[in-house]
Amino acid sequence: MKNILEKDVQGSIGAQKYLCTISWRNGELLMDEPKNIGGQDLGPDPYSTLLASLAGCTLSTLRMYIDRKGWNIPEIQIALNLSQNNESELETTISRTITFSEIITEAQKERLLLIAEKCPVSKLLKNKINIYTQL
């Protein structure tokens, strides 16, 4: 199976509790935990970063489709959060609410909902994921 990214995303952490530096092909991102659990809140936490990936992918996918259709929808907003149920096995639910700056028809709404579900990160999160870790 071929890697999707040309270069690995890399991360490091030093002695400062929870502060991580994440590097990708063209930059760096600080990740941290909120102060209420011992971090300094200097960057997004891992859950926020995961949701940001889904937000960015959803917005970009919708923008491509809207532009291709020539629809007058200049701005799209998205809000995401997640919840977890740990009763028998871990179950995570992500809520994603999309709003538009213009009124859209019911037909557009139905189509854009389908397109949002087809964004690559949404499809990735809904399918089987294997994580192989080595030391």
Where are these regions (language model features)?
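Alpha-helical metal-binding/catalytic segments enriched in His/Glu/Asp
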Residues: C57-T58
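Extended beta-strand/beta-hairpin segments
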Residues: M1-A52, R63-L135
